[in-house]
Amino acid sequence: LQVTARAVTAEELAAALGDGTFSLAGTEVRALGSDAECFLLQWASTSQENVSRYANSAYDTLLSVIAGAEDETARLGCLHDAEALLLEEGAVAPLYTTVTAWTLRDGLTGVLRDGRGWFSFAAVVPRSE
């Protein structure tokens, strides 16, 4: 496979992504929330953000299960399965990522982060030495 990169304007890229007239495109993908579900929703078959036109009923079913999951362990398992489908079927090919860094002041402990990416500081207490 030989690829020749060609620069395009933002308008040309948006048009090509919108109507599917591309073979390979490099674009920034962001989630609207700090949770894997927010990221994965972009490839649901009904999503307008699904520029790759990825369609897989098993993937859509996993997203439905994830959305209604009350058991955090089951939800995380489904998130991993959905991500694996995207990667195995070549719907996405991540090249790099940026991350959100955070830290808790020395001497404190107890911050919690749930499976949806939300932080809870209700249990933060001074660290016992």
Where are the regions that the model predicts?
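Bilobed periplasmic-binding protein-like "clamshell/Venus-flytrap" ligand-binding domains
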Residues: A25-E28, E70-D106
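Solvent-exposed, polar/charged alpha-helical surfaces in well-ordered, non-transmembrane soluble domains
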Residues: E11, A15, D19, S57-S64, ...
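Hydrophobic alpha-helix feature that most strongly marks membrane-spanning transmembrane helices
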Residues: L1, G18, F22, R30, ...
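Short, solvent-exposed loop/beta-turn-alpha elements that line the ligand-binding surface or hinge
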Residues: A16-G20, C38-G68, T97-E129
